[in-house]
C-alpha cells in the first residue's frame, strides 16, 4: 500500500456499501436512510479528467481506503453525492465488488468495443477479475468468449459463468490452440492477470487489428517485435478502474 501512496495512520477498505446517515445542505439526489454503493476512485477535482467525470484518468487520485479514510469503520465520509450509487433492493454483498473489480473490467470491455458475430475475445485469468469480466461481458452482449487459465476447475466455473470455450494455457502450443479455438478471428484479449506469459500469448495469438486490453497487475515483462504494432495494426492498451458514471451504468 505504501507503494501506491498510502501513509499511516490509515483506515483501509475501498469496497464500501452502507446506509446514508447524514447529508449536506446542497445534496439533492441522496436521502438519509438510502442504501448506496460508494465510488472510491476519487480524483483531485481540479483537472480536466475530473471535470469530465474521468476520475480514473486523474494523475492525483485521492482514493477512499488508500489516501482517504476507508470503509473498515462504522462511518465513511464521501465528499460528493455523485460518488454514491443507489442500490436499493439489491444485495449489498453481491454488489459491492463491482466498485472495484466490476468497474475495472466494465471500463476495459467498453474500451474493447463491439465484436462481429464471427469474432472472438479471450479473457486471460479466471480469478475474481476474470470471472467478473465473463459475467459482465455476457450481460453486455459478448457471445464468443474464450476463458484462459491454468486451473481446470476455474475453467469449468468460467464455462458455467458464460464462456463459450475454455483453454488451459499450460499447453505448449497455447498460441496456436488459442488461434484455432477462435477460428483465426481472435480480435480482442482482456488480460486480467497481467503477467509475462499472458502478455506473450495475447500479442502472438491475436489476429490483425486485434485489441489487447491489460488490467491485471501481476507484473513482469513480455517482449514482441516492435514492427508487429504497424504490421499487425494491433492495439495494446492499459485500463485502470473506471469512472463514476460507469459504475452507475454498471449497477
Regions found by a protein language model. Give the residues of each.
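N-terminal Rossmann-like NAD(P) cofactor-binding module of classical short-chain dehydrogenase/reductase
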Residues: 37, 187-190
Amino acid at each position: 500500500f505504501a507503494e501506491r501512496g498510502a501513509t499511516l495512520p490509515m483506515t483501509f477498505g475501498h469496497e464500501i456499501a452502507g446506509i446514508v446517515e447524514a447529508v449536506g445542505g446542497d445534496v439533492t439526489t441522496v436521502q438519509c436512510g438510502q442504501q448506496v454503493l460508494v465510488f472510491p476512485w476519487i480524483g483531485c477535482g481540479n483537472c480536466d479528467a475530473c471535470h469530465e467525470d474521468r476520475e480514473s484518468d486523474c494523475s492525483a487520485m485521492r482514493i477512499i481506503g488508500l489516501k482517504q479514510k476507508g470503509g473498515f469503520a462504522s462511518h465513511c465520509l464521501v465528499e460528493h453525492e455523485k460518488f454514491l450509487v443507489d442500490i436499493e433492493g439489491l444485495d449489498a454483498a453481491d454488489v459491492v465488488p463491482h466498485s472495484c473489480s466490476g468497474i475495472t473490467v466494465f471500463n476495459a470491455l467498453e474500451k474493447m468495443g463491439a465484436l462481429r458475430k464471427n469474432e472472438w475475445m479471450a479473457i486471460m485469468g479466471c480469478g475474481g477479475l476474470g470471472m467478473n469480466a465473463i459475467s459482465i461481458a455476457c450481460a453486455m452482449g459478448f457471445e464468443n468468449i474464450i476463458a484462459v487459465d491454468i486451473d481446470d476447475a476455474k475453467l469449468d466455473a468460467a464455462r458455467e459463468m458464460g464462456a463459450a470455450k475454455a483453454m488451459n494455457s499450460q499447453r505448449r502450443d497455447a498460441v496456436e490452440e488459442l488461434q484455432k479455438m477462435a477460428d483465426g478471428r481472435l480480435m480482442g484479449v482482456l488480460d486480467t492477470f497481467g503477467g509475462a506469459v499472458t502478455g506473450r500469448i495475447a500479442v502472438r495469438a491475436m489476429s490483425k487489428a486485434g485489441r489487447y486490453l491489460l488490467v491485471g497487475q501481476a507484473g513482469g515483462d513480455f517482449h514482441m517485435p516492435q514492427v508487429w504494432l504497424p504490421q499487425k495494426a494491433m492495439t495494446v492498451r492499459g485500463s485502470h478502474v473506471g469512472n463514476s458514471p460507469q459504475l452507475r451504468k454498471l449497477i
